[in-house]
């Protein structure tokens, strides 16, 4: 959603902070909020003026006409305010059809004034600009301001100056107040623009001799501008409309939505309701709600929501478990229904999202059975067969009744089944597997089809009979612009269209190339890509079986210069970059069409794009769209889904039906419906779900009217806006003569007691004429073919098509099979069609899922269990969860081996490298490369040597004598500095810990007996730290209970123990590197006097 209402308190706080005007605004920041939890003593301490002034009190919960409802207390003392609040605060009230609790009130100073000092001011956004309304008689009885007020349109990118205000708005205002009003309205408009408001109303605005008072205020801001206005807005709150509570679950889903690139929405309508929905797609979610309400389920509909934009399995799981948790809290005598619906996805992996839902169903299978929940599923899109399979499987394994349907079933048919209006088929038709389409594309003969390169009736000149006409039922203000109806160029795309793709969207580009290939285009439609975050290079793609290279440019200018044949740009930039990149694109005259995919571009910026596009003669599709498709010619990005859907919906060749919709998912559903009921799609465009799409329904309908190959037009309209009325006008005035089938979704909105913002930003009616019901009625009366519901849309399309065929306007042609396109390896593997031995294997770590996993343990569990470094090392090195004492011992080993001064070879090398100006990694590596048999490598050797002696059964004295006889050193014995008289405290600390905590220490005991023998000969032949760690580690591996004897011996043999020294000493080496850098030590050169130069005598003579 884009425009969101804010509370009066928030609106005034922002206005008082940021408005710039010469008018003296009084009572700045004088307001106090009261809730049922308010501490009055604290309130009086924070707002002492409450005791000294007369007061006004009113609810601040987005309630209109509070004065007429008796919800404003005027000219009261503080005690009077308390008395007035007593029967109201926390109590239930009914406002229109909505019933809710009054729990948020605003107290302000009372302003004595006369009726003549009250004025009305309102600013609101439209496509063309911002309207400023002013009426010289404000207050409770202002009446119909649209009819009475002075109105001034400030066009996009234009400024409002005080002289225009005086001339056009303050015509009837008192002369002595014109100056102050003009200054205030000018400042108010600048404030409105700067903080991205979409609606701002002050009634009354009171102007007295003391200055300006803002008594009542209502406002909406563009929530998508948060990234621009965050500093000024702060943490702004968006309260729910009166009559609907704010639930923590809604806030949780909103938080998930904010953290995700996908779209996740949830609105609770009736938590005790019987019918729950979990629908994929903004448009589809509205259609399902419509159908439920049409079939009499409005009072039982529990929620509205949608998920779209390819959420991950984990995100879908979180969304699903929230809904399942809500619906299993209260029982219903008739059981409950969960509708998991959706249109045909364009790029969302249905199997991945369904696996998240399946996880949630498994987690809640007990409560679901207890509450007698029946689930109905219908979905299509990439890998949907696998998604439906796992959904059906979970029904069998859990015993929950789950009815599963695919694209062979009409999208909303499951609603009728769920509510008992139509039978549930025992065995629905089985859709072909994804791979079947690709391996045998010509197998389906369900629809007669033409060649791939021409429409059925491209060459026919017969004009279609005009649609039947009737008197239009349009409100006078429904068509704001009186300009004549004119279309832009009728052809946006052809078989030779070339495009540049902005963004590293390799999957979308490959999809476009596969579409081009299956349409038998001569060349790929993507000429180049632009991506500012890399240097110029080439990206590899497939053209059928052949690999090709597509250039990627860092700068758009280079791409345009080297590809002058390009006239389309597909913009995949993020919502933060989409505006700037689109503005830059329009500087190049070669570009005639731009598709903006991003959702969430602020409306004010979109209007600037529209204005510049009109000046440049550029057609914009979007924002917030999947794009469009012209079968046999060109497709934008992910439109039409993957190849299986392209082939199933016959999108590889043109038909005779053109459509335009707002929703990307619903456009794919139209592809499916049209392919099943007619000869197929000629062209289809999804203009996007924002309130101000770059191109409108009428722009494309007029193109279709002027395109000979299009014989009938389908429009899927939507609640919000008045664009559909232009179609009515076009039909009645004879500008549109081809048959038009139209249905506006969102009819359910009129049945809800409180306002619901649907999935698309523009799907909200701001006046009666913007409702879907009003628009459908007007279209019907204008002579457009309007079904009774979306359920009947396919039947109406088929009826109109068959009539055109019967009259010879359309002549179906023979199908020509498309070429076979190979399947990508990655997708074939995803579908389970192929297998290949992996080049690498790993068993310690998995980063592919929602969270990192160490040897089977999620990272969250690692921290929850406080496993520490020792525990993590146990997981990654040994794939075992070690006992607590073992983890502690490992950490102690790392501590005692961390460093042993700068004189040892490894530290010395590190210091030399650091002083030579080398980087951290180079310096560390030079130190590590000295580790071997002479330095630090004794851990493994000592462990092996002592283990072999102990396991062979020879006594310590025999072992010492044997090593002496063989002339070998005993590894782990001896120290240059430490001796039995000067013990190494590191050894002592570890030895005491091991003896105290280890269950058994036979090898350590053996080594200590050896030490007694060696020190008796020479005091420095002690068991050193390497030797102690080596033998103690063997004891730990053998006796901690986590390893078999074979596993313990294997870890010793493969050199695991030397890893302890390497890991520990790395900390010290890094310390030495940082120390030298911090001390700013220069290049080291060894002094001559410390080098003995020994040269051959004959060379020195």
From Swiss-Prot:
Record PTM Phosphotyrosine, positions in chain: 131, 682
UniProt region (Disordered), positions on chain: 440-485
Biological processes, Gene Ontology terms: acetyl-CoA biosynthetic process; citrate metabolic process; fatty acid biosynthetic process; lipid biosynthetic process
Keyword terms of this UniProt record: Acetylation, ATP-binding, Cytoplasm, Isopeptide bond, Lipid biosynthesis, Lipid metabolism, Magnesium, Metal-binding, Nucleotide-binding, Phosphoprotein, Transferase, Ubl conjugation
InterPro entries in the cross-refs: ATP-citrate_synthase, Cit_synth/succinyl-CoA_lig_AS, Citrate-bd, Citrate_synth-like_lrg_a-sub, Citrate_synth-like_sm_a-sub, Citrate_synth_N, Citrate_synthase, Citrate_synthase_sf
Phosphoserine modifications at: 263, 451, 455, 459, 481, 663, 839, 1100
Reported regulation of activity: Phosphorylation results in activation of its activity. Glucose 6-phosphate, fructose 6-phosphate, fructose 2,6-bisphosphate, ribulose 5-phosphate, and fructose 1,6-bisphosphate also act as activators.
One GO molecular-function entry: ATP binding
Catalyzed reaction equations: oxaloacetate + acetyl-CoA + ADP + phosphate = citrate + ATP + CoA
Keyword Metal-binding set for record: yes
N6-acetyllysine carried by residues: 540, 546, 554, 948, 968, 978, 1077
Modified residues (Phosphothreonine): 447, 639
UniProt EC number: 2.3.3.8
Binding of citrate, residues: 309, 346, 348, 364, 379
Post-translational modification: Phosphorylated by PKA and GSK3 in a sequential manner; phosphorylation results in activation of its activity. Phosphorylation on Thr-447 and Ser-451 depends on the phosphorylation state of Ser-455. Phosphorylation on Ser-455 is decreased by prior phosphorylation on the other 2 residues. Phosphorylated at Ser-455 by BCKDK and dephosphorylated by protein phosphatase PPM1K. ISGylated.
Location in chain, cross-link Glycyl lysine isopeptide (Lys-Gly) (interchain with G-Cter in ubiquitin): 540, 546, 554
Compartmental location: Cytoplasm, Cytosol
Reported cofactor(s): Mg(2+)
Function text: Catalyzes the cleavage of citrate into oxaloacetate and acetyl-CoA, the latter serving as common substrate in multiple biochemical reactions in protein, carbohydrate and lipid metabolism.
Family recorded in the similarity comment: In the N-terminal section; belongs to the succinate/malate CoA ligase beta subunit family. In the C-terminal section; belongs to the succinate/malate CoA ligase alpha subunit family.
The protein's name: ATP-citrate synthase
Organism of derivation: Ovis aries
